[in-house]
Structure formats: C-alpha cells, structure tokens
Amino acid sequence: MEKQKIDYLEKYSIVVVGSRMMLELLWRSGIGCIRYISDFISQVDSLIDCTLDPLEANQYDIVGPRSEESNVISYLFPEDRTELKRIMKGSDIVVAHKNMLEVSKIAEEIGVPFIPDIVTTFLPDGVKFWELEYPKVERNPISYAITCGLQALEIMRTLAGQKPILAPEAILVDLKEGIKRVCLRKIGTA
C-alpha cells in the first residue's frame, strides 16, 4: 500500500470484541481509535492468544493506552444491548472473536461491516452472519495468529478502498489442511 493510504489509517475507528491479538495488530498498524470490548479470559483463551499472559486467565481483560498517540478505549462487555450498541456506534468496522451473534446483529443495525473469528467480511446489506452454517474451526496458537494476521490484512485492504473477502466466501486456517478458501452454506441447504 502507498504511504498516504497507510497514514490515512489514523482517521479510522474499529471495534474489537474479545481478541487482544487483533487489538495489538490494529494498534501497531496505525488505526486511530480502537474500542476494545473485553470479556472474561478463560484458560483456553490464554493458551491460544500469545498476547495474553497465562496468569491473566480467569479475570476480565482490561487494556490501557498503548502510547501517547494511540486512542485505545477499553470496555467490559456490557450486559445491556443498548450499551453495546452505543459503544459500537460511529465505528468503521467491527471485529468480534466472542459474542459474535449479538455483535453481528448490532453491526448490521448500525450499518457497519462485521468480521467474525474467520477471514471474511459481512456487509450490512449483504449475507447475514446468522444465516450461514458456521464452520468448525480448530483453535490453537498458530492457526489463531495466522487468522488474526489475515484479518488485519483484510481490514487494511478494506480501509484502503480495496475489496475484501466478502461472505459467503471465507478463508479458514487449519494446521492439518492448511489455508483454504471456502464458500459458507446457508442454513438449511445441502
């Protein structure tokens, strides 16, 4: 990408739900504002996401500012849907690795592209997240890091005006089968 387009990233606001690794990648890429909505860190989360300290397991994930120039705002995942919608409003893209169904519905309501924990983008006026059979994805540190990296690349491409991978097309990362492009099926179709 051209330097102008990369510098322009500081003008964007992205919501990240439940993935500290995505937060780190986007912050280091120069995104201007990141609203990080955290959740409870399980033992599995701390094993899969290498940006989490295993001692942080069984706690809520709170992050602070990353630098004087960055605008990282941390929230706990709210119990109230109205509050979640308020936090998400005004963002340019929403990425969720937890609470995906609820977050996808709000993203559609507020007219923002939604990216789940696989490599694809759901546009507000396109295929709906909840209408597709969601693939079973094996989670381990390597496949998770590759998935997050590919998602960050897709976000940069989208913000630079290039076409991302749009649902129902998706990329899945599996250590046994490699990186593969798939077409997600609508629920109820064979």
Where in this protein do the model-derived segments appear?
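Adenine nucleotide-associated cytosolic modules
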Residues: 1-190
